[in-house]
Amino acid sequence: MAAGGSGVGGKRSSKSDADSGFLGLRPTSVDPALRRRRRGPRNKKRGWRRLAQEPLGLEVDQFLEDVRLQERTSGGLLSEAPNEKLFFVDTGSKEKGLTKKRTKVQKKSLLLKKPLRVDLILENTSKVPAPKDVLAHQVPNAKKLRRKEQLWEKLAKQGELPREVRRAQARLLNPSATRAKPGPQDTVERPFYDLWASDNPLDRPLVGQDEFFLEQTKKKGVKRPARLHTKPSQAPAVEVAPAGASYNPSFEDHQTLLSAAHEVELQRQKEAEKLERQLALPATEQAATQESTFQELCEGLLEESDGEGEPGQGEGPEAGDAEVCPTPARLATTEKKTEQQRRREKAVHRLRVQQAALRAARLRHQELFRLRGIKAQVALRLAELARRQRRRQARREAEADKPRRLGRLKYQAPDIDVQLSSELTDSLRTLKPEGNILRDRFKSFQRRNMIEPRERAKFKRKYKVKLVEKRAFREIQL
């Protein structure tokens, strides 16, 4: 085993010495120059990478990079450039006549002519010309355009020119008169007019034309609905505060406002007491017991169950007899009618139709004598409809100033801003402020049916609260 291990180790060390490039000290070591170079497949990507890292590949890359640099900087290879491009004849300095100092104006003009640095950065520094030859199949309709050019060349030899050329020549021969731009003295002063009035002077040229044509050609604006011209509420936007809300009110005005605020507070207190009375728990004597609850649940069930069986018992035998024994009328219908019976039925039917027609004619004749009564009934009906219409109109006018219910909540009037008699001061510096402008504007919008009343969103927990007892606490607890 030891010998085998030492042999393997010797092979591995000799291989590493050979790969390192140094001459080994072992007798089995080989000169790196005489070592055979390892070759591999060159048609695979692995071979391409190895070839690029070898000296020949690096030399080729450097040569190609040098060629590209010469093409970018000088426009071609320096070895192929002529002598005039590489050398010049020195005939002396050209700055002899420029010994004079430049003035500030000259310096400024030179600075203005000098291009900006940002423009120089964006300029193309490469001298390699852009490719101009485009293949024919890359141009859309190339064959068609080529045939067109050949056709126009043929027509040009015959003296016929394209339409665009003929139009250009006609414009040159007959130039149009240039219109002078109107100056401020040439403009006609137009009087002011109401933009929203019905007699708009801009609409006068469209008067008398077809409305459908004007709408389709977009020369006539869309007609605004009449409801957009009416306000949602006739209430004023800004309400004047009552006289009692002044910082220095009279005694009567202040007492009147205090009584109004007192009535509002009493009404609110009554509603709260009513709600509390309805939701209050009943007394011990009136509390519901288990027996009373069961009796209420069974209320009306026992009487209905006793009376339900009697009708069914009486109907059972009769229904069975009806199914067993057919009625005589049913037997008569099954028999075939004779010709005499059919003639009698037709005569009876014809007689009934004649009697009905005579009766209808008699009634129509009698209606002629009831014209006065019918007119009176129509007049009463029209008067009733007019009265209902007036009542609806009056109700609508009365509710015009009242807020409508636009959403889920009703409109609640704001509290009356009033100060007590003890809070009134004789100085504006010590006056206590009342109300809020932002809240007042929002309440005004709600009262004028412009926005719906809202309330603050209630907090609702999305998950259930879970109580967990910690293990450390559970172990310590006795």
Swiss-Prot record:
Span list, region Mediates interaction with human herpesvirus 8 protein ORF16: 342-386
InterPro entries named in the record: Nop53/GLTSCR2
Biased composition (Basic residues): 35-49
Region (Mediates interaction with NF2): 181-478
Pfam families assigned: Nop53
Record PTM text: Ubiquitin-mediated proteasomal degradation is regulated by c-JUN. It is associated with relocalization to the nucleoplasm and decreased homooligomerization. Phosphorylated upon DNA damage probably by ATM and DNA-PK; may regulate NOP53 degradation.
Record has Phosphoprotein as a keyword: yes
Induction behaviour: Down-regulated by nucleolar stress through ubiquitin-independent proteasomal degradation (at protein level). Up-regulated upon mitochondrial stress (at protein level). Expression of the protein might be regulated by DNA damage but results are not consistent.
Tissue specificity: Expressed at high levels in heart and pancreas, moderate levels in placenta, liver, skeletal muscle, and kidney, and low levels in brain and lung.
Any GO BP annotation: positive regulation of proteasomal ubiquitin-dependent protein catabolic process
Region (Disordered): 1-51, 303-344
Role according to the record: Nucleolar protein which is involved in the integration of the 5S RNP into the ribosomal large subunit during ribosome biogenesis. In ribosome biogenesis, may also play a role in rRNA transcription. Also functions as a nucleolar sensor that regulates the activation of p53/TP53 in response to ribosome biogenesis perturbation, DNA damage and other stress conditions. DNA damage or perturbation of ribosome biogenesis disrupt the interaction between NOP53 and RPL11 allowing RPL11 transport to the nucleoplasm where it can inhibit MDM2 and allow p53/TP53 activation.
Family according to the record: Belongs to the NOP53 family.
Subunit structure and binding partners: Homooligomer. Interacts with PTEN; regulates PTEN phosphorylation and increases its stability. Interacts with RPL11; retains RPL11 into the nucleolus. Interacts with CDKN2A/isoform tumor suppressor ARF; the interaction is direct and promotes ARF nucleoplasmic relocalization and ubiquitin-mediated proteasomal degradation. Interacts with NPM1; the interaction is direct and competitive with MYC. Interacts with NF2 (via FERM domain); the interaction is direct. (Microbial infection) Interacts with herpes simplex virus 1 early proteins ICP22 and ICP0.
The name this protein goes by in its record: Ribosome biogenesis protein NOP53
Native species: Homo sapiens
Organism lineage string: Eukaryota, Metazoa, Chordata, Craniata, Vertebrata
